[in-house]
Amino acid sequence: KMSRTASEGLALVKENKGNISLIEVNCETDFVAKNKDFIDFCKELSEINFTSKGDLNKINECKMSNGNPVKDNLVNLISKIGEKITIRRANFYDNSKGINFFYVHSAIEKGIGKIISFVKLEGVLKGKNEDIGSKIAMHIAASNPLALDKDGIDKNIVDKELEIIKAEITNSGKPAEVADKISKGKISKFLNDNSLLNQIW
């Protein structure tokens, strides 16, 4: 089972006194992602993450409600369900330095879905302008930016995109000086489209 790809699964978010637990657990099929045992396991991990604060090694060693560590319960769940299951990633955000906001896309129940976006904002006041946080979180889920700003986009991704753009222009038979101008315009558009602060709102 370990050689198979676990590309389905669930993302979970839980809030406790303004602190946020985010966790992603993968399985092989959408069918298993809807399985009660799988969902219950994920929910308990989401709670455990408040203690382990996003550290996967700590999560694996934590005892669950049945008294067994997460790693043993994971092995048992894999054996019972018959699919590869992996705890892909976990994050924890405390309630200091701003207010935490999140958005759950395609929620199957509260705090559980396929995609969860998260944003922490400073200068936002509860009850005043806090709806901006929820709107930004929703925008992130819809537009999937690669980074906060242009400089944050991985150089390898930019270089690869530039390579693709140049190959397309070269194949179209445009003169070099025109090709250079077009490639600059296209890479600028790519950077704007993929950085949150430059995306169209």
Regions found by a protein language model. Give the residues of each.
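N-terminal assembly/interaction segments in proteins that build large macromolecular machines
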Residues: 1-201
